[in-house]
Amino acid sequence: MLAVMSEKTIALVTGANKGIGYEIAAALGALGWSVGVGARDERRRTDAVAKLRAAGADAFGVSLDVTDDESVAAAARLIEERAGRLDVLVNNAGVAGGWPEKPTTVDLKTVRRLVETNVIGVIRVTNAMLRLLRRSAHPRIVNQSSHVGSLALQTTPGVDLGGISGAYAPTKTYLNAITIQYAKELSGTNILINNACPGYVATDLNGFSGTQTPEEGAAIAIRLAALPDDGPTGQMFDDNGVVPW
């Protein structure tokens, strides 16, 4: 198995059983990569893998709850046993609170839940997978961020990001900040880490109110996952280029 797997790029996409995550997995599979479909829900994970395989992708399921230490450790063990390394990690899993949501009235339980998934979950998965990524010749990390996490955009007059967000937007700002710190720590290595802004995509995260399709939203993460060795690191991008922090 390891001999066969070593000939392919090995990717793991968290939250890949639906929405943007599924479309990222599908596109990477279409490139001929072996793609781990990370998801908590066993039925949805199994269905997503079956659908991807039916389309010709080399997909495999990874039981993964980004908020649980043992689940993440078990996922790392599975990938090591299956492939011996990891080439691309796409931290796509995320949750949203209410919208709009004022910081003066936000439920602190909501804030904690969002930070646990959108920030700590990314740190937990990234740190667990770093040992496997270091074995790759071309390791890439892509974190799914958002325009709403950009402090520059949030403070630019006339820019409409959908109203006040007391929980979700700040978690993406926090994610942006930690990505910068990872880039600083990993400078001098061959690991490239960047954040992707998918745009306003119609998913269950926003009650399918978005104006873009999941396929369109997946495009920038796919580009960042396949960056050349001299590609950028420590930046945030959307389909039009660099997004200010």
Residue spans for each PLM region:
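Canonical Rossmann dinucleotide-binding motif of NAD(H)/NADP(H)-dependent dehydrogenases/reductases
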Residues: 4-36
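Conserved glycine-rich Rossmann-like NAD(P)H-binding loop of the short-chain dehydrogenase/reductase
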Residues: 31-47
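The beta1-alpha1 cofactor-binding region of Rossmann-like NAD(H)/NADP(H)-dependent oxidoreductases
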Residues: 42-43, 63-77, 108
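A glycine-rich helix->loop->beta "capping" turn
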Residues: 57-58, 78-91, 97-99, 107
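Hydrophobic positions on the long internal alpha-helix
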Residues: 90, 125-129, 133, 178-179, ...
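Catalytic loop of short-chain dehydrogenase/reductase
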Residues: 95-115, 134-187
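C-terminal helical subdomain
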Residues: 173-176, 188, 195-196, 203, ...
